[in-house]
């Protein structure tokens, strides 16, 4: 799942999961509801609660740092200035019988973007160079790449490494070509990195 526009849509997703989720499915949830320390205006507490319930049913989730704070109740002000160990500890608090991996995305530290991959064995950090601000759609591309690779049989950490390499090239090219950030990134020539 990704962005959910209404309570009605969330309930349809829950009904689908009740019918089809089993040990042979991989449920990847990108709990889109917040960024840069702020919950999106269209999300009320009930919508945030619905996304949190979905995340708890997933096998893998990919919250950004703000979404991790919403899911865990941690302070964004504190966690955004913390090191990866503290972020991994917060992410690990979400792990349960179903949720086996939490990938915290897009953590900006100086000239680097970190992604923390936490599972029951611990955590790893996957980093890339930061190129200016953010481009529209990169979170969606990341989630799609990791979801596709894990369904194909890749471990979540390996899938994250490939997705980060894929996106780093696309973002670098878009930055160097002065692509309007609202138009997304030039990713097509990097699709081979996902094979």
Segments the model singles out, each with a brief description of its role:
Residues 69-70, 132-156:
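Short, small-residue alpha-helix embedded
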Residues 126:
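Hydrophobic residues at beta-strand termini and immediately following loops
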Residues 3-5, 33-35, 67, 106-110, ...:
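Glycine-rich beta-alpha junction loops
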Residues 41-123, 157:
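Conserved phosphate/ATP/ADP-binding segment of small-molecule kinases
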